[in-house]
């Protein structure tokens, strides 16, 4: 399930000993699991902090508690304490399932489109403060999207749609034949590039 290296165990044990609280352990949880924003959270946990449904992993000198709801997302996780090329030491957590898994080949076109939008397209648009939401996926394979944030009203939305989003969706999701914009860009209040400024 979860692998915690000897170096990481030694690191945690020293920190816990410094705290001097009887029964203190380390709690591991997944934050925003199943999304591109997913992250792992480690924190000290005194016995009174525990809810009682955590999974307990006995380590050398302490217990690692995994929040019950986070267990599926942490399956296969590796916790290590590594020396970087700069000589600094750092705790690392690799949790391959924390952001979710791509839909199976048998998944519907809608599931596949939503996955690609949330895990590939929106993280790229976020650099401009933008995002897209899937409004509809027709049986014919036409995807209808609604732009938001910095993309709502942006003068480059058409280029983003055709050269970025449509190309990505058609290349990654079998059956997608076109991507259309359902956004009323005239109502955008903070576009990344105002429509009248686009070349």
UniProtKB/Swiss-Prot annotation:
One of its GO terms (molecular function) is 4 iron, 4 sulfur cluster binding. Binds 1 [4Fe-4S] cluster per subunit. The cluster is presumably bound at the interface of two monomers. Its cofactor is [4Fe-4S] cluster. [4Fe-4S] cluster binds at residues 151, 154. Keywords: 4Fe-4S, Iron, Iron-sulfur, Metal-binding. Pfam families: NifU. Homodimer. Involved in iron-sulfur cluster biogenesis. Binds a 4Fe-4S cluster, can transfer this cluster to apoproteins, and thereby intervenes in the maturation of Fe/S proteins. Could also act as a scaffold/chaperone for damaged Fe/S proteins. Belongs to the NfuA family. This is Fe/S biogenesis protein NfuA. It comes from Xanthomonas campestris pv. campestris (strain B100).
